[in-house]
Each structure stands twice: as structure tokens, then as C-alpha cells.
């Protein structure tokens, strides 16, 4: 791996609750009571946002840093892949959450954001350059910093020679997440979505959990049973938005069900969205 430094952005789009303003970027750049400043941290680049009373929603930094014209691009996803995780050509409006990779010849380039940022971050890219979007909203409204400084994100970049994409991705993810938060023991067990598809009751859960307990008898690390979409009070085939305050008639006592699972040696889990 060869860490690479970012050049300075050439432009910045600042979005508040009331307006959007494009500004040529000079480090730092100030507009009204908002200042955006970039500071190196080793090979990485930290993005700091300071503001008074103006609610800040998003900071977009544009880098006029040419990329290989015929590269294949793979970007991140917000939650998980839905059959759309792929290497493909440039699509300038394609949203790539957290990171993206470029493959050109025997070289793989990587761009990303360190884990645990203070913003929701995504990238766009084309052969003439790339942008990173830092959404710092608090809920749906701009954050009110009231004189404070927010380290919104730390940007990272690296280059890999003679490395296939999978290897480069694995190495770069270790850079983005140097201190991963891992469970004490492997997480395994059952989830009732991919056979019940939302049509299950407490009796079904207890029957399947009993089979799971028998299959894992004697193991100190006990399995989980995840009660997926099926339990919530307003469960329907065309809607899964809650509320999440109680079970439906098939699940009359959710705390009691969790207790029964624990007593059978199963760790209870629950699905919400």
C-alpha cells in the first residue's frame, strides 16, 4: 500500500437551512459565520467545520484531480448490497457512501472516510475529478454549532500496485477502521425472515428456537434467534414502518417471549427498521 495525500479542493458547496452557496476553496474558507478548514493528520485530511448560529446541513468539497479515463469504479453502499455491488464505469451522479475504489491497469486507487465520522459521507467521481459530501444535519435540520468546531470527517487515500481489487479493499478497510468494534464471541444463529417472510407467530418462533437449541447443545457460545418482520403491531405485507411499541395478536407478550428464549438457552434478537 502506498498512502497518498489529497490535493486541496478547488471548490466547496455549502448548504444551510436557508441557502446553498458555491465558493472557490481556500484553506480555510469562510462564508458569513461558517468556516471550513482542512488539516493534515499524517497522510489523512481532517475536515473541520466551525459556525456561529447559522444551521449547517452539508459541506461538499470538489477536487479537480484527474482520474484514469478508462477506470472501473466500485463504491460503497448505505446499508448492504442488493445485487448492485459492482465494478463499472464512471457515472458522475452515482452516490458512493463512505468509500470508492478505482481499477486501471495493474493499479487500484482507494478513497474513503475513517470510521466514526461526525457526518454521513458519500463520494461522486468522474475522470475530471471527484467530490466528497459531508452531511452534518441533526435529524433533518442543520446542526447549530454556536461557536463550536466539528471535526466532520477524516479523508483517506491510498494506491495499490499489482493487487487485485479484493485484496486492495481488504487492506484499505483496515486503514479506514483501525480499531474495529467486534463482539466478544462469533455471532451465529437463526433468522425467521427467509422462510417465513413476515408470516409467523410466537409459537413458530419457540418451535424453531427449540430446534436451534438442540442443534447447538453443549456449546458455551449460545446462538441468537432474530425475530424478523412479523411481530410488530401494524404488520402488513405492503408496509413495515412500525410502530415498534408492541407485538400483534401473534406476539401478545414480547418481553415474555424474550424470557422464554433465554430460558431455553437462546439469545433473543429483534428486527426493527
Say what each PLM segment does.
Residues 55-57, 146-147, 221:
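Short loop/turn segments at connectors of secondary-structure elements within structured domains
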Residues 93-186:
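Beta-strand-rich recognition/accessory modules
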Residues 186-273:
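Aromatic-lined carbohydrate-binding/catalytic grooves of carbohydrate-active enzymes
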Residues 47-49, 146-148, 225, 261:
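Short low-polarity hydrophobic stretches
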Residues 17-18, 37-43, 124-131, 135-137, ...:
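Short, ordered beta-strand-loop transition motifs
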Residues 46, 136-139, 174-175, 209-212, ...:
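Short alpha-helical segments and helix-capping/turn motifs at coil-helix boundaries
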Amino acid at each position: 500500500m502506498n498512502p497518498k495525500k489529497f490535493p486541496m479542493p478547488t471548490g466547496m458547496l455549502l448548504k444551510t437551512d436557508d441557502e446553498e452557496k458555491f465558493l472557490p476553496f481556500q484553506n480555510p474558507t469562510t462564508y458569513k459565520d461558517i468556516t471550513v478548514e482542512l488539516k493534515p493528520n499524517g497522510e489523512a485530511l481532517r475536515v473541520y467545520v466551525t459556525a456561529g448560529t447559522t444551521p449547517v446541513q452539508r459541506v461538499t468539497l470538489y477536487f479537480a484531480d484527474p482520474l484514469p479515463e478508462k477506470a472501473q469504479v466500485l463504491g460503497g453502499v448505505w446499508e448492504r448490497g442488493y445485487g448492485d455491488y459492482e465494478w463499472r464505469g464512471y457515472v458522475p451522479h452515482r452516490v458512493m457512501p463512505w468509500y470508492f475504489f478505482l481499477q486501471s491497469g495493474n493499479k487500484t486507487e482507494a478513497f474513503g472516510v475513517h470510521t466514526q465520522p461526525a457526518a454521513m459521507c458519500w463520494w461522486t467521481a468522474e475522470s475530471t475529478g471527484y467530490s466528497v459530501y459531508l452531511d452534518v444535519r441533526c435529524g433533518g435540520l442543520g446542526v447549530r454549532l454556536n461557536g463550536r468546531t466539528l471535526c466532520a470527517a477524516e479523508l483517506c487515500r491510498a494506491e495499490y500496485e499489482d493487487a487485485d481489487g479484493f485484496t486492495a479493499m481488504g487492506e484499505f478497510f483496515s486503514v479506514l477502521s483501525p480499531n474495529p468494534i467486534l463482539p466478544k464471541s462469533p455471532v451465529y444463529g437463526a433468522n425467521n425472515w427467509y422462510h417465513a417472510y413476515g408470516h409467523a407467530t410466537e409459537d413458530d418462533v419457540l418451535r424453531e428456537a427449540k430446534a436451534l437449541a438442540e442443534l447447538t447443545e453443549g456449546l458455551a457460545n449460545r446462538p441468537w434467534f432474530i425475530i424478523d418482520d412479523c411481530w410488530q403491531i401494524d404488520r402488513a405485507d405492503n408496509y413495515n414502518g412500525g410502530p415498534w411499541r408492541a407485538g400483534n395478536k401473534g406476539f401478545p407478550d414480547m418481553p415474555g417471549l424474550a424470557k422464554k428464549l433465554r430460558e431455553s438457552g437462546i439469545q433473543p434478537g429483534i428486527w426493527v427498521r
